[in-house]
Amino acid sequence: MYAITLIGYLLHTYKDPSRPFSVILAEETENEANGGGTGKGIFVKALGHLSNLVRVDGKNFKVDKNFAFQRVDLDTRILAIEDTRRNVDFEGFYSIITEGITVEKKNKDELFIPYKDSPKVMFTTNYTIPNMGNHAKRRQKVFEFSPYFGASKTPEDVFGHKLFEDWDKDEWNRFFNLMFNCVQIYLESGVLAVENSEKLHRKQVRVQFGEEFLEFLMAQKEEKEVWITMEFLYNEFLKMTGFEKKEYSMKRFSKAIDESCTILKIAYSSTRSKEHSNRKCIKFVETNLVEQIL
């Protein structure tokens, strides 16, 4: 149902100025090396059969580069930035998501398309797109593709024909009916709210802070209700992973603890302890205790 309302939103021209957001097509897999081939490209291609859609290669895309959006026109309805790279600077896209888009074309005057007329923005990625902070979260609607399709099982294997290319009139009519129903359901219900999967959350931590940190955190979080100095925890991390301080700084480690616990919904408390020379200490908290307090 979530996918249906997202399709309806993308196909309809209305954009709510009070709730601007982009659509992110991700994958329900923890390891980005196993990603790809799940159907994100087919999803984008399907939308392009009903809406004026511009596809941009996101691997080497830079939002501040001259002529970055030169293929966008006044009648462009969807801008799909595909295969975005690891740790893409999502903040760099804030203005085109919330305010409008400036289009530069060679040997032509600059054109600004205001928010209400600008294309809706969609990303596809095998990784995750950072969303720490309320600003980023409000500007993202993530849809995860399961690994049902992949290199060993393609849509052609399942359906017995190539999607779109091999369709007859009846198949196209079924497709159009489905897409129009998506728009109708979106108009009735809006875009539904869903929680992202635990796999996506772990992938986000892995991409931002490393596999070694994720493994360390998942082990440490089992030590409940014990105060530990951040310095001790950091040294244990260095010892376990073999990192040097210059490779993984205390500042990065502290940020990783704070942001990863937020992403993974790991409950913890922090304080400055007089018993430990006023150094920062943390302890991981039993979830049911937090729920009782709330």
What are these regions (language model features)?
Residues 19, 24-25, 72-75, 141, ...:
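Short acidic (Asp/Glu) and glycine-rich catalytic loops that position anionic groups and cofactors
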Residues 56, 169-211:
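Phosphate-handling catalytic cores of nucleic-acid transaction enzymes
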Residues 58-67, 87-90, 106-111, 118-119, ...:
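Positively charged interface segments
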Residues 75-78, 117-121:
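Loop/turn-to-beta-strand initiation segments
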Residues 76-99, 130-136:
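Conserved AAA+/SF3 P-loop NTPase catalytic/coupling segment centered on the Walker-B
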